[in-house]
UniProtKB/Swiss-Prot annotation:
Residues 81-100, 223-235, 257-270 have a biased composition (Acidic residues). Residues 20-31, 45-60, 236-247 have a biased composition (Low complexity). This is Cancer/testis antigen 47A. InterPro entries: CT47 (IPR028930). Disulfide bonds: none annotated. Strongly expressed in testis, low expression in placenta, and very low expression in brain. Residues 1-102, 207-288 are annotated as: Disordered. Residues 1-10, 207-222, 271-282 have a biased composition (Basic and acidic residues). It comes from Homo sapiens (Human). It comes from the Eukaryota.
Length: 288
């Protein structure tokens, strides 16, 4: 080896491949940028030259520099690691939305085919609730035959209930209102006091006696009225003039009728004679 200052062989060997491989990587990257954009997945594809160019210096560099170079090699140029991580969840969300839409469509189809399915369940719930209430309802009134027979009877039983009540007199009722108004209801109280109190029987026996007593009183009054009527024709005799007056009236009426009939007949005869005279005059005038 010459003394002109050749470097250490190991250092020369390390730098030489780095420079050569870096130039190759830059040339390959420029070519990929020009021709690789036309394809759909050009940003996702990592050039082989870049991987090779980075793999060479990893052996000679330190641990930190090697890790950085490996990270750059793993990430594609057209995107980032976050974009790659978002691709997976986006596709999953789209699939879930499609599945939900399909399920909703199936439900809508079922609802159109069977519109009364909900009403069926509502009716069943209503019937169930009604049966539950009827089974647990303890205050239902049931007719008792004995009580109904006792209630259906003569009207006297109902009257007995009302007969025991004390009578409400008009003065008491009006007096309560007059006490509230001092000086206004005195006239009403006096008028109510003048009204006789109604007689209210206390027992059924008295109520039964009243119609019998009324009937007996009516009979007595009728007998008393019949006796003076029978005595009047014996005491009072019609006078002779009163007895003859209607006979004269009856006799004079036919005579008047005969006179009227005779007058009417005489008038008819006169009219007939006048008509004959008129006809004779007409005949005589024609003959002349």
């Amino acid at each position: 080896m010459s003394a002109t200052g050749d470097r250490h062989p190991t250092q020369g060997d390390q730098e030489a491949p780095v420079s050569q491989e870096g130039a190759q990587a830059e040339a390959a990257g420029a070519g990929n940028q020009e021709g690789g954009d036309s394809g759909p997945d050009s940003s996702d594809v990592v050039p082989a030259a870049e991987v090779v160019g980075v793999a060479g210096p990893v052996e000679g560099l330190g641990e930190e520099e090697g890790e950085q170079a490996a990270g750059l090699a793993a990430v594609p140029r057209g995107g980032s690691a976050e974009e790659d991580s978002d691709i997976g969840p986006a596709t999953e969300e789209e699939e879930e939305e499609e599945g939900n839409e399909a399920a909703n469509f199936d439900l809508a189809v079922v609802a159109r085919r069977y519109p009364a399915s909900g009403i069926h369940f509502v009716l069943l719930d209503m019937v169930h609730s009604l049966l539950h209430r009827l089974s647990h309802n303890d205050h239902i009134l049931i007719e008792n035959r004995q009580l109904s027979r006792l209630m259906v009877g003569p009207h006297a039983a109902a009257r007995n209930l009302w007969g025991n009540l004390p009578p409400l007199l008009l003065p008491q009722r009006l007096g309560a209102g007059a006490a509230a108004r001092a000086g206004e209801g005195l006239g009403l109280i006096q008028e109510a006091a003048s009204v006789p109190e109604p007689a209210v029987p206390a027992d059924l026996a008295e109520m039964a006696r009243e119609p019998a007593e009324e009937a007996a009183e009516e009979k007595l009054s009728e007998e008393a009225t019949e006796e003076p009527d029978a005595e009047e024709p014996a005491t009072e005799e019609p006078t002779a003039q009163e007895a003859t007056a209607p006979e004269e009236v009856t006799k004079s009426q036919p005579e008047k009728w005969d006179e009227e009939a005779q007058d009417a007949a005489g008038e008819e005869e006169k009219e007939q004679e006048k008509e004959k005279d008129a006809e004779n005059k007409v005949k005589n005038s024609k003959g002349t």
